[in-house]
């Protein structure tokens, strides 16, 4: 099967390559560092203890291989613009339909969750602020930066990513200084790396606690693949994408591992408060009185970055589906600024609907957990399809792999190993009540997609192939 784009040859009707190397580097960084690190790391530390460092390292390593597989696939054919394109080519339009719409859903529900988070952070300064003012302001703001040129989106994500980097760098520097100087906390605890080793017992909660850490930590990596969705809008993808992907392990080690080591060195794992940000606690212990306000600003921009990335990703995914006849044709139209404006408006409306449904829940926390779990399950499916596409690519296009200058390390064997790991992650997500509910909702979603494809698209596709 030879892949053919369903796009016009007119360059005015194609996505514009407006993203520079610095944009993609920070977009990739923003995708690898989510709100979960700033706000959720306290819970992961309390659940898993020092072994949480291994949890983040294992998940990060697995997703690095996913990104390498995606990178080789995207660069093997200049016509590939996203995972929908290579999954269509390798696995057929049916799987591409599933993965495209599932990826879209994952970012829609993530966007709704991000809006909830932004409202919470805004209430830190303005407790009586009407939530709907925040909702419409956020969506309007992100629309402006996405409607006119892809470079505007890139600039916004660049600065959002820079804020994250600075915040984590400051934490690591301040924490390292506290360790070196033997800082003593008000309760008499002396900062030391010995707290991380925990007298040789890095699994204080046992294997159960270690596995529980995966359930929470997986959410922190949602969006790591977003750099791949920019392939059609990067000025020099063959140079820029490998740089962005190759830097992922360094970023994970530096920003996740180092920050967790510093946090647990200053505050022993069993003294970390689960429902508080360990970043806030660190700055407070260091005597920075405006720590809460500073970290609130950082997590606010982190949630805003995630929502903005979600709007970008959903619009490009819908655009790709529309050009492959997996979505209404009108959603595949580009504006004079070379952006899929109709797809942007459609995705924003769905994010608004998602927030509305979530806000009606009697328990916002429970609803938040469910929607983020649905997102994580959808992402596990998407990441798995990337790996399966790579396995098929290696079998059916050996000549392309032989010519590739960006080969995935480990090849097919690594793909199967990571697929087994993802299956285990899915099993872990069924062990908790809220995440099991999300699992059942996800099954309903896949059943809905199956019925939709069979009724509306399967026969149409078969006729066109005759």
Question: What name fits each language-model region?
Answer:
Residues 1-41, 46-51, 64, 68, ...:
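Membrane-interface "cap" regions at the ends of multi-pass membrane proteins
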Residues 160, 330-341, 380-434:
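C-terminal membrane-solvent junction of multi-pass transporters and transport-like membrane proteins
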Residues 79-80, 102-117, 221-234, 292-329, ...:
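Membrane-helix boundary/coupling elements in multi-pass transport proteins
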Residues 3-8, 84-90, 94, 114-135, ...:
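Helix-loop-helix connectors at the membrane interface of multi-pass transporters/channels
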Residues 16, 39-134, 144, 250-253, ...:
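Extracellular loop-to-transmembrane helix junctions
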Residues 119, 133-191, 222, 245-249, ...:
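Membrane-interface loop-to-helix entry segments
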Residues 85-88, 92, 124, 197-200, ...:
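TM-loop-TM module centered on a large, flexible mid-protein loop between adjacent transmembrane helices
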Residues 3-6, 10-11, 15, 52-53, ...:
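Helix-loop-helix junctions that connect adjacent transmembrane segments
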């Amino acid at each position: 099967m030879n892949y053919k784009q369903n796009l016009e040859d007119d360059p005015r009707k194609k996505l514009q390559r407006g993203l520079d190397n610095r944009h993609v580097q920070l977009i990739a960084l923003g995708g690898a560092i989510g709100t979960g690190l700033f706000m959720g790391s306290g819970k992961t530390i309390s659940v898993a203890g020092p072994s949480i460092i291994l949890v983040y390292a294992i998940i990060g390593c697995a997703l690095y291989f996913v990104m390498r597989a995606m990178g080789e696939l995207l660069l093997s054919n200049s016509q590939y613009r996203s995972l929908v394109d290579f999954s269509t080519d390798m696995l057929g339009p049916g799987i591409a339909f599933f993965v495209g719409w599932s990826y879209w859903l994952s970012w829609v529900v993530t966007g709704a969750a991000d809006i909830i988070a932004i409202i919470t952070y805004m209430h830190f300064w303005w407790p009586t602020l009407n939530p709907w003012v925040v909702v419409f302001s956020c969506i309007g703001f992100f629309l402006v930066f996405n409607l006119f040129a892809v470079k505007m989106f890139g600039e916004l994500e660049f600065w959002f990513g820079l804020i994250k980097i600075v915040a984590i760098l400051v934490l690591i520097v301040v924490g390292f200084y506290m360790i070196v100087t033997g800082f003593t906390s008000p309760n008499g605890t002396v900062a030391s790396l010995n707290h991380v080793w925990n007298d040789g017992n890095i699994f204080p909660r046992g294997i159960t606690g270690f596995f529980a850490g995966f359930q929470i930590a997986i959410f922190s990596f949602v969006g790591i693949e977003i750099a791949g969705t920019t392939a059609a809008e990067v000025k020099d993808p063959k140079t820029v994408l490998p740089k962005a992907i190759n830097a992922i392990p360094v970023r994970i080690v530096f920003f996740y591992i180092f920050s967790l080591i510093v946090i647990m060195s200053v505050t022993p794992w069993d003294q970390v408060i689960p429902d508080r940000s360990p970043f806030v606690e660190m700055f407070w212990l260091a005597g920075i009185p405006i720590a809460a306000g500073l970290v609130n600003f950082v997590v606010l921009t982190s949630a805003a970055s995630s929502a903005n990335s979600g709007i970008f990703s959903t619009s490009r995914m819908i655009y790709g589906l529309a050009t492959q006849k997996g979505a209404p044709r009108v959603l595949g139209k580009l504006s004079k600024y070379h952006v899929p404006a109709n797809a942007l408006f459609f995705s924003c409306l769905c994010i608004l609907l998602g927030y509305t449904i979530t806000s009606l829940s009697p328990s916002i926390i429970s609803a938040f957990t469910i929607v983020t779990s649905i997102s994580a399950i959808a992402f596990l499916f998407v990441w798995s399809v990337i790996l399966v596409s790579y396995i098929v690519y290696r079998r059916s296009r050996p000549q392309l792999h032989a010519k590739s200058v960006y080969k995935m390390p480990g090849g097919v064997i690594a793909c199967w190993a990571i697929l087994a790991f993802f299956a285990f992650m899915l099993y872990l997500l069924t062990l908790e009540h809220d995440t099991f509910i999300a699992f059942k909702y996800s099954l309903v979603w896949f059943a809905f997609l199956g019925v939709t494809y069979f009724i509306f698209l399967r026969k149409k596709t078969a006729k066109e192939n005759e």
